[in-house]
Amino acid sequence: MLMALNPGTDAPIFMSIPHLSLQDARHLQLAAQGLLTPRRAKAKPADLLATIRRMALLQIDTISVVARSPYLVLFSRLGQYDPRWLEQLLAEGDIFEYWAHEACFIPREDYRLLRHRMLDPAAMGWKFSANWLATHQQEIGQIIERIRQHGPVRAADFERKGEKGNGWWDWKPEKRHLEVLFTAGQLMVRERRNFQ
């Protein structure tokens, strides 16, 4: 039994604790994720946005065995659809990319729910480094100016100086600059090309 106080009188309100069987809990989770909803005969672009809204976000995972993970997640809910619709949603601003545990596509209307993270990026752990930002102010300023003058950039637009990197996390400085600016909400992803 749970007890709460009535806001008007401070009198106790007793509530019973809801009980879900394991089967009901599983069913509830599958339904919330849209996996129990019958598919349309043919998916439409609006269905893709509705699906992301229903899930609240779509994790961006670059692992690809059959296809990139986000495409498989959408296929499991929509069936056959045009993968370019996801890029169109991003380009049109219906979804945005940001950290929600990991990198995710998130409906535009939920931007306000994550803005506090952008305003306090130091709480984001490895995804942000105030020390990096301070140490590389000049180079970061040059990247921002380049974007202002010439438009969006990708980390791939910058050549690695010196030896080739040796692993997933051996990022060239420009990639790290862009990631820090992204985490601080100073840059947003406008589009992806080949999932970059």
PLM regions with names:
Residues 4-7, 12-196:
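Long, low-complexity intrinsically disordered regions
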